[in-house]
Amino acid sequence: FVGDFGPEGLRPGTDIVGADAAWDVPLAPYFDMAEIAWNNAGTQLAYTCKPLTGTAYAVSTDSDIFVYDLADGKTHNICKPFDGKARYNAAAGHKPAMPGYDKYPVWSPDDRQIAFLSQRRAGNESDKARLFLYDCQTAQMQDLTEDFDYNAMNVVWSGSDMLYFIAPIEATHQICRIAPSVGEVEVVTRGDHDINAFSMAGDRIAAEMCTISMATEFFDVNPADGTLTQISAINKPVYDNIRMGEVQKRWVRTTDGKQMLTWVILPPDFDPAKKYPTLLYCQGGPQSVVSQFWSYRWNFQLMAAQGYVVVAPNRRGLPSFGQEWLDQISGDYSGQNIRDYLSAIDDVAKEPWADENRMGCVGASYGGYSVYFLAGCHEKRFKAFISHCGIFNFESMYGQTEELFFINNDYGGPYWDRSNTVAQRSYANSPHKFVEKWDTPMLIFTGEYDFRIPYTQSLEAFTAARVRGIPARLVEFENEAHQVFKPQNSLVWNREFFGWLNKYVK
């Protein structure tokens, strides 16, 4: 709705989407207000909308950017041809019929252009996020990051001739920029850190930055050379009284001859003459980078502080190493990325300080699936497993999740499509089909409000483990979803997490 606000309050508004159009604005499930943007003159509103319903909505990610004009009350879709015909011709400068996610419109200061993020493939939420530029006067589109093999996010204008954005690059998040007239991306910042948000502050940049060893603080960034100067030190009194473990960057050779970046976090006061219990961390997503993130849930330094070496590989399927590396996992859940996990833990296990007789494996979401799958093929590597909201049964998962487009893309299709070799390979390698090989204690977390990977997946896994006679424990949060957010529940989660590891691994 768009309505006037005056001294008497909010006047009756105008439904700019239409009462008969049951469309998401902004998009579910996060309803991010960054998907809605007024122009600077206050005369037009750009917003993200997914103009689909029913089954079409469930199997596609096709959203578009719409622009509503306050003066004439008209709306137009800048991502699709106005006449509904496929008239896209790149050589002629026509607009593409953009079938994937189109999100996050940002107006230029002069209101002549709209920058936004676009994905080419409908149904693939992990397709490359491209930075597009729409000219409001000529209706021409420009893909600014066509030759840049990383995602773009958090787009900010600097004047009307320069765009800054964040990109994941080799397991870090950096500020980049591009002048549309030049067309070449420049990486502004460097280093092992995650810049998660920023804004222009005159001729400087104010940024939020974290590392594996530091929660988010504010930094000043010099756009000329990318130099970062810390502004805030909110947590210094805390850091002054605790010890952090060393974070090592390790390149591991995979079974197919690639190099894989793996973070190794050592316990505080690490002594190379001693042997330490070691954890393999399996990342979720599955297309979600193992970067320099600081988490209140999966905190590597907290694990290290308990005396564990943490091995966190950027296995196949994770962003920041190019789209080919990321795409490989789709249709191959049980394949190369699983071998990548084992390559990482086997490489670290060769170190004299890693105790190969005291190893555990932990992960959430896709990482939870990885735990279930590895439980059936780890060949006695691990003494204990912990799975948080993991996928256990691919067939039942297909009928339970609220993101059907995701399952179709990552599994290859529905389980009943017998002619689809990719899909049939996926379902043939569902973890529940290898339970007869499970022989290792399993702790399982889940949330009753989880609609991404419903808690019934965890119930199935727990039942299977208990019937098999394997030590198993189920921790179910009745008021949590896919993650644990409530502080009291987080305390319970960590107590259970480390209690299990200390009992069976340490």
Language-model segments: residues:
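A flexible loop/linker signature enriched in serine peptidases of the S9 family
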Residues: 1, 19-32, 48-66, 77-103, ...
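Non-catalytic accessory segments flanking enzyme active sites
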Residues: 1-16, 22-25, 34-37, 44-49, ...
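Short loop/turn segments that connect beta-strands within beta-propeller blades
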Residues: 5-8, 69-73, 135-139, 179-183, ...
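Residue-level detector of Asp-centered blade-edge/turn motifs that repeat once per structural unit
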Residues: 40-41, 109-110, 158-160, 200-202
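Hydrophobic beta-strand positions that form the internal "hydrophobic ladder"
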Residues: 45, 111-115, 162-164, 205-206
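Short beta-strand element of the alpha/beta-hydrolase
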Residues: 266, 274-284
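Serine-hydrolase catalytic-loop signature spanning alpha/beta hydrolases and amidase-signature enzymes
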Residues: 286-288, 310
